[in-house]
């Protein structure tokens, strides 16, 4: 998830430094007790590459972060949102960033890794 945040900044975006202090939300974005289970759902944006890969409108994701996208970087398209409106994934051309940890989510995230490998 740190890479997601760094990518956003590299594209000229900004971050909330501490979600609990800077945003009102009922979503726990830092569920350290259960890092390998879904903490909340995200809504995928139809027409994005991520939506095409996953094929679902809503998926459950783990959530281990205290920072998040404030202003989205230039040229990035938001491809998933948490129920509180926080951007949880973005993309552009050959770049895909997700705020969750797909490596800890099991087989349901295999398509993300397949897309990455095929893009090499």
What role is predicted for each listed range?
Residues 1-14:
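Catalytic nucleophile loop
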Residues 17:
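Acidic/charged, solvent-exposed loop-and-adjacent secondary-structure segments enriched in E/D, K/R, S/T
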């Amino acid at each position: 998830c740190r890479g997601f945040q760094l990518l956003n900044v590299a594209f000229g975006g900004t971050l909330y430094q501490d979600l609990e202090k800077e945003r009102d939300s009922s979503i726990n974005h830092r569920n350290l007790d259960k890092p390998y289970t879904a903490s909340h759902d995200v809504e995928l944006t139809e027409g994005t590459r991520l939506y095409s890969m996953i094929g679902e409108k809503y998926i459950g994701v783990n959530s281990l972060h205290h920072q998040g996208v404030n202003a989205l970087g230039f040229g990035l398209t938001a491809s998933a949102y948490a129920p509180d409106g926080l951007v949880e994934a973005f993309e552009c051309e050959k770049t895909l960033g997700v705020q969750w940890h797909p490596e800890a989510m099991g087989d349901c995230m295999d398509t993300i890794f397949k897309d990455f490998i095929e893009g090499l």
